[in-house]
A protein has these predicted regions:
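Auxiliary Fe-S-binding modules of radical SAM enzymes
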Residues: 1-45, 221, 228-333
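N-terminal [4Fe-4S]-dependent radical SAM core
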Residues: 12-90, 99, 103-109
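N-terminal-biased segments
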Residues: 81-83, 87, 103-107, 175-191, ...
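Short coil-to-beta-strand
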Residues: 90, 94-99, 196-202
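Conserved alpha-helical substructure of the radical SAM core
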Residues: 104-137
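Short strand->helix junction
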Residues: 108, 144-145
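Conserved AdoMet/S-adenosylmethionine-binding subsite of the radical SAM
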Residues: 124-128, 145-275
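Glycine-rich beta-strand-to-loop/alpha-helix junction loops that act as flexible
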Residues: 139-143
Length: 333
């Protein structure tokens, strides 16, 4: 399998996905796209947005997914059910091609035929114009950190609109590049790192090199980079959470490699596994076109992998620790 040249592709996509001088980001046009057919309600915000309904419950033995509802509920002082929906905007570029991604690949290629140039102020205006708008804005993708300016721009736009205290901002990060440090000013990094109404979820795209490379089409050695980048983000003081996907093409050594995965997480912070939510990959929507024999095997093997994760978690943490609300687990101590 030929690997994506991640760093080269990242540079090309960034050049086509952000205009720092005019503070514009290339945002996917969801209306009229293949993705629109998978939505439970029509796109909003002139076709550039969608409302995502987050699900807390998952089929056993998969752990419940409290993100981003529980952090949002804590900040906003609202019941979790009031923040289970989010206003999603997707930047139109991603440097990896995860086969299970729910976004059509033509919305990840920084193609202006399927996207539009918008400022954070324009996105916030579109959001505020929605009559029944969610209390959470999810800056998704794509890979938002190909355009890291987007997050501080959104924070500033919400503040200027007088909405900063009533909206919880959330973003995804696939832990693939150092653009947060390369392209943001000290002031912007400080803003993002200390912003009270912001949370970031970082996705580990596997539990070993083989699963990572299979899932992303990136070089296997970039799996180690994910841990290095998370360590740097942790130093910012940002409110961080994690996802992990356990789809893997090979069943041999799952228990051993899962133990090593937790070792590496705990080397970053002893409580980090308690802030990580494993995601069960499902075969639906645009994903169905990408599923062949290998992917079917991976979908089955993730069920073995989650048992290994649960066993390791039970061996390393008490029942009381595992039942703590995710927001009660500090990574700053």
């Amino acid at each position: 399998m030929v690997s994506i040249k991640t760093d080269e592709l990242s540079e090309r996509l960034r050049d086509r996905a952000v205009r720092p001088q005019t503070r514009q980001v290339l945002v996917s046009l969801i209306a009229g796209s293949e993705q629109e057919g998978d939505l439970s309600e029509p796109p909003n915000c002139n076709g550039y947005g969608r409302v995502r309904h987050f699900r807390y419950e998952t089929p056993p033995p998969w752990p419940k997914n409290p993100l981003p509802m529980v952090p949002a509920a804590q900040y906003l002082g609202r019941p979790v059910e009031e923040v289970s929906n989010a206003q999603v905007f997707q930047n139109a570029a991603c440097n990896w091609r995860c086969w299970y991604c729910y976004v059509p690949f033509n919305l990840l290629a920084a193609n202006e035929q399927h996207a539009g140039w918008l400022t954070a102020e324009e996105l916030v205006s579109l959001y505020l114009a929605e009559a029944d708008r969610p209390l959470v804005i999810d800056c998704s993708g794509g890979q938002p950190d190909l355009t890291p300016e987007w997050i501080p721009w959104m924070m500033e736009a919400l503040a200027n609109a007088g909405a900063a205290e009533e909206v919880y901002l959330w973003s995804d990060d696939n832990l693939s590049n150092d653009y947060f440090w390369r392209f943001l000013s000290d002031e912007q990094r400080q803003l993002v790192g200390t912003h009270r109404s912001y949370g970031r979820v970082c996705c580990f795209k596997g539990f070993n090199e083989a699963s990572f490379a299979f899932n992303t089409k990136a070089a296997p050695d970039l799996f180690a980079r994910q841990f290095d980048l998370f360590a740097r983000l942790l130093d910012t003081g940002m409110d961080l959470y994690c996802y992990a996907t356990f789809t893997t093409p090979q069943g041999e050594g799952i228990e051993r490699d899962m133990a090593t995965f937790l070792d590496r997480l705990m080397a970053l912070h002893p409580r980090l596994p308690l802030r990580l939510v494993p995601l069960r990959i499902e075969n639906y929507g645009v994903v169905q076109h990408r599923v062949g024999t290998e992917q079917q095997t991976a979908l089955a093997l993730q069920e073995q992998a989650i048992l290994a994760w649960n066993a390791e978690l039970a061996a390393r943490f008490t029942t009381q620790e595992r039942q703590l609300p995710i927001v009660s687990i500090s990574l700053l101590e």
